Amino acid sequence: RFPTVYVIKSELVEIRGSGSATREIRAFMHPDNFPNAVKLNAVEVITPDGNTSSYPPHRHDGIGDCPFHNEEIYYFRIGEIDSPHGCSSGFGFHRTYSAPQDSISFDDNISVRDGDIYLVDRGYHGPCTALPGYPMYYLNVLAGPSLERNMGFCDDPTYSHIRQDWKTQRTDPRIPWRISK
């Protein structure tokens, strides 16, 4: 049996990206914060309305030159301004596409609604886009065959400039996220 792990919320929250790619990560089951799990990783992502997350597109499928291998599940919740989730009219977008070295070619651009679940077992994925007026939350759960648990990823080199661009942009002031109602 594993010992009980207690982590203070303020130690879990990370602000990632900047500009319209600012989002909040709650890394409650990241290997650094929850070291006793064997395979499972999990984080929550909060994307303000009009912003993108899971960006730049990345992969962790163990194919080609990417050494990280995790399947990933996205569980989406779509809200309205000042409401955490449960909006039946709102939706967002998610993209998953093949890397050049993949044996199968695909490019899936899908709309996601409140309560949708999406499995990423290979390829690049991102961005997730929250439409104006509809903030997006998702729970990411990752696990894979690696002997050492990790949340590593390989960015799509086409978008290598994105992380550099963030250095010249301000973070979105809506993050950290607060519900005002």
What does each of the following model-derived ranges do?
Residues 24-73:
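A short glycine-rich, His/Asp/Glu-containing loop-to-beta-strand
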Residues 2-8, 39-41, 51-60, 85-87, ...:
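A short secondary-structure junction signal
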